[in-house]
Structure formats: structure tokens, C-alpha cells
Amino acid sequence: LPYKTLDDNRRPTLIICNGDAGNMSYQQISLAYLYAANGFNVVTFDWRGFGESSEFEMDTDYLCYTEMLTDYDAVIKAVCKDKVVDKKQIYTMGWSTGAYLTMIAAHNNKAVKGCILSGTPSSFEDAIPHLVKVHPKGKTEANLLVPDDFPRRKMPSLIAPKFRKDILLVVGSEDNRTPLWMSEKIYNALPEGINKKLSIYEGAGHGGTEFPFFVDWERWAEETIGFMTF
């Protein structure tokens, strides 16, 4: 990959995972600048089928693909092999679709120390009926599908009781896609004795310009960097 580091010192590393748009965009660029300027290696990636990644036919009625978890695991493994990565300080970040994929990937992989999630669905059983009610394009459950081989039992609220990683859950008070109660359900199920935080951004929504990162940049920067340097 085309990148350059100031030196060969090992640094904490953050892997950033997009939402269901799936490819590297302006959000990742802005976030990469923020964390790189504060001493982190930053890794972004395209899902297969997006950007410069391999072709992969997708049905837009599917909320996700199991291959996305395979891709995430491959990125984590590649990061672990890099000589400038502090292997004890690998964090992951994701929002929306990327949020639940990020928590599952962190849960599955011993190399990940913690994760930062924003706009996180608690489970498909919670999210799909809710999305049917609020989706601007009038989606039905027939248009909100999950692959048969996707590990549904590893969705955030279901793995939370056994989750032993650092976790920062961010949610906008006005998020109508993954409302506050979903993040509260995940947070309340987490075990005691781990570094965990639920952060509510007043006036923020789910994504786009309403994403918490855009609503309060300074708070986002302070909280997320503080979380990873705890």
C-alpha cells in the first residue's frame, strides 16, 4: 500500500470501517487526518465490490454480507504483520452497518484491544422492524434481508455479556435509524470490569451531516482519542 511513516517506531493503530456505503469516503479522510496527527497509524479499506477492491455482486436488499466479516478479519491480520504497529494497541471504529461488523470483528479477534461504535443496531430482531417503520424509501421486511450464513447470534446486544474489550458506544439523541435505546440495550448488557462508555450527542442523528462526528468535532476528537489512550 502507498504510505509513508515518519520512522519505524511502533504506534497504536486504528482501523476505520465505513457504513453500508462500503467505500473509503470523505469521512474516513477527515478521521484519518485527525488520528494520524495525534500519533496513530490509521487504516481504511473498501469492502469488496467497492472502489479498487475485487468485483463482488451485491443484492441491495441485503443489509450485509458474511464476506464483510471475512474482509474485516483479513484487514486485522494484515495490520498485525506491519512492523510499525503496536500489536497491543489495535483499535477498530465503525458506524451503522460498520458498527455491528466492528463489534463482531473485535469480539472474534484477540488482536483487537477495543472498538469505537456509532449508530449501532442492537440486533436484527430489533433493527429490521424498526427500519420498516422509519425507512424513508418505504422498505418492507422483504427488502431488509440477512444472509442465511451470517452469524446473527453475534449481533451486539447478544455478544455484549461476553464482550471483554474496551468499548465506546456513541449515539445521537435524534438518531431515528438506530435510536438511543439500542445503544443502551448493548451497554446495559456489557460486563462489569471493562473500559466501557456510552456517549450521547445531543441533536445528532444517524449519519451524513447529522453524524455525531460532524455535530461536535471537538468532543468527538477528545473522547475518542482519550478512549484509545486510557
Describe the function of each predicted region.
Residues 10-19:
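Short beta-strand element of the alpha/beta-hydrolase
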Residues 20-33, 47, 181:
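The serine-hydrolase catalytic nucleophile loop
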Residues 24, 50-82:
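Catalytic nucleophile-loop/oxyanion-hole region of alpha/beta-hydrolase
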Residues 35-55:
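Conserved alpha/beta-hydrolase
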Residues 104-149, 162-163:
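Hydrolase active-site cap/lid region
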Residues 163, 169-171, 175:
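Short beta-strand/loop motif that positions the catalytic acidic residue
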Residues 165, 179-188:
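Short alpha-helix in the alpha/beta-hydrolase fold that links the catalytic acid
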Residues 192-230:
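C-terminal catalytic histidine-bearing segment of alpha/beta-hydrolase fold enzymes
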